[in-house]
A protein has these predicted regions:
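An active-site-proximal "capping" alpha-helix that borders the catalytic cofactor pocket
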Residues: 32-45
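Short, charged loop segments at secondary-structure junctions
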Residues: 24, 63-95, 126, 143, ...
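VWA/integrin I-like adhesion module and closely mimicked acidic/polar interface patches used
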Residues: 125-168
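DG-centered beta-turn motif at the end of beta-strands
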Residues: 18-21, 32, 57, 96, ...
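Von Willebrand factor
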Residues: 76-115, 150-163, 182-190
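Short beta-strand-loop
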Residues: 51-80, 162-170
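Von Willebrand factor A/integrin I-like adhesion domains
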Residues: 153, 157-214, 221
């Protein structure tokens, strides 16, 4: 039995890929955990997103873990993450894209319509699993050019290489979000608000305008 609510409504799926490597220790991991908490709280307070937004959280340090398997926002329980290890970001991207494809198949199996899924990536550094870079980058390019996902990469703090992140965006020319390590929690508020906007939109629309970014987040083009 698939973990899907509100079969008659159009759904939006979102995978959060979050960095829990050693450099995220201290304030950054606390900010991340608080961000994941307010993200769920905001979705659950919206009567539409409550049953139509589906969420998955994948963490990556030395290992990649699916800490929250896909579930309706109504059932989302924020994880409490700890920092340590390297930065297996490329493996996380591949895992996230696999999770999206599996969720889309579940939607199709039960006849649920869906908006283009979202992949949100947050990191404070650069990947250490470079042997998987080509695979991860190509998978993203195929998905983006095939209009199969929306991708939101975000670098936090001075150690994040936004130019490296840019290579993962559509044709290497998409936007990268940027914020300080001490103040990126609002990205999760923006993400949940934008998902709520999409979930409330006319299902026949092909494009929806998202919420404006908060002042604490900049865009690098």
């Amino acid at each position: 039995m698939y973990n899907i609510m509100n079969f008659g409504e159009k759904h939006i799926a979102c995978v959060l890929l979050v960095d829990v490597s050693g450099s995220m220790s201290g304030d950054a991991i606390r900010e991340l955990n608080e961000g994941l908490r307010v993200f769920g709280e905001a979705l659950q307070s919206d009567s539409k997103a409550y049953g139509c937004a589906d969420v998955c959280v994948v963490s990556f340090g030395s290992a990649v873990q699916q800490v929250v398997p896909f579930c309706p926002a109504a059932e989302y329980v924020p994880p409490v993450l700890t920092a340590g290890g390297l930065t297996a970001m490329n493996e996380a991207i591949i895992t996230g894209l696999d999770m999206i494809e599996m969720r889309k198949q579940e939607y199709k199996d039960v006849g649920v319509d869906y908006w283009r899924p979202w992949v949100f990536l947050l990191t404070d550094g650069v990947p250490t699993d470079n042997e998987l870079y080509q695979d991860a980058q190509q998978r993203l390019q195929d998905a983006l050019n095939g209009k199969k996902i929306n991708f939101f990469p975000m670098g936090i703090g001075g150690g994040a290489d936004t130019q490296a992140l840019k290579k993962y965006t559509k044709n290497g020319s998409g936007m990268v979000l940027k914020a300080s390590k001490e103040n990126f929690q609002e990205a999760f508020v923006w993400l949940s608000s934008s998902m709520s906007v999409v979930s409330r939109s006319d299902p026949s629309m092909s494009k929806v305008d998202l919420e404006p970014l908060p002042n604490t987040i900049t865009v690098e083009l």
